[in-house]
């Protein structure tokens, strides 16, 4: 893993290399024209991993901030937190080996209230409260069956007017 302060997504980014290391020399298996990124956002930096986790797992956590605005973020609540712990593993596609990550299973112990909703959306749908009375963190699991949209997404917002948009481009597959 290599953290960059001048990445292609708007500053902070983490690039990774796959290969073999004999204790002295690293031989990179990446094709020269392929750059591999750990995350597609600009708030993933200074990744730290642990190799001695149970079951020989590789767990990573990153700093979620960006020097373009790190000093302008308010100092309360959500300033420059760490990412959720992720289990890292490699998988092969064609002639390349890639990194995948998934939230570490220990996070399941943090779950409390669960509420499931199922509905169809044609255009826009607003859900006022995900879990009434919850003022903490949310975990959202989506199963989306798309029939016609080029881009799908959702927006989370609060009473203060703060919002986060998530989008997925069906054609680009990202």
Enumerate the predicted regions with their spans.
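Recurrent small/Gly-Pro-centered beta-turn motifs in extracellular repeat architectures
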Residues: 2-5, 62-64
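Short glycine/acidic-enriched loop and turn motifs that connect beta-strands
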Residues: 6-9, 67-68
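Short, well-ordered alpha-helical packing segments
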Residues: 1-3, 16-17, 46, 50
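Structural motif
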Residues: 9-18, 84
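Beta-rich accessory regions
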Residues: 22-174
């Amino acid at each position: 893993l290599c953290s960059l302060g001048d990445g292609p997504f708007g500053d902070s980014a983490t690039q990774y290399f796959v290969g073999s290391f004999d204790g002295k020399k690293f031989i990179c298996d990446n094709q020269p024209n392929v750059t591999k990124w750990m995350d597609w956002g600009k708030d993933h930096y200074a990744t730290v991993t642990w190799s001695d986790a149970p079951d020989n797992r590789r767990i990573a956590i990153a700093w979620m901030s960006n020097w373009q605005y790190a000093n302008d973020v308010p100092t309360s609540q959500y300033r420059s937190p760490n990412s959720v712990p992720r289990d890292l593993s490699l998988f092969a596609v064609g002639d390349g080996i890639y990194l995948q990550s998934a939230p570490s299973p220990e996070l399941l112990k943090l779950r409390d209230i669960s509420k499931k909703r199922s509905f169809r959306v044609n255009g826009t749908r607003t859900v006022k409260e995900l879990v009434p009375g919850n003022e903490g963190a949310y975990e959202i699991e989506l199963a989306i069956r798309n029939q016609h949209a080029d881009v799908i997404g959702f927006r989370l917002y609060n009473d203060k007017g703060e919002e986060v948009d998530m989008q997925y481009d069906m054609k680009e597959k990202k």
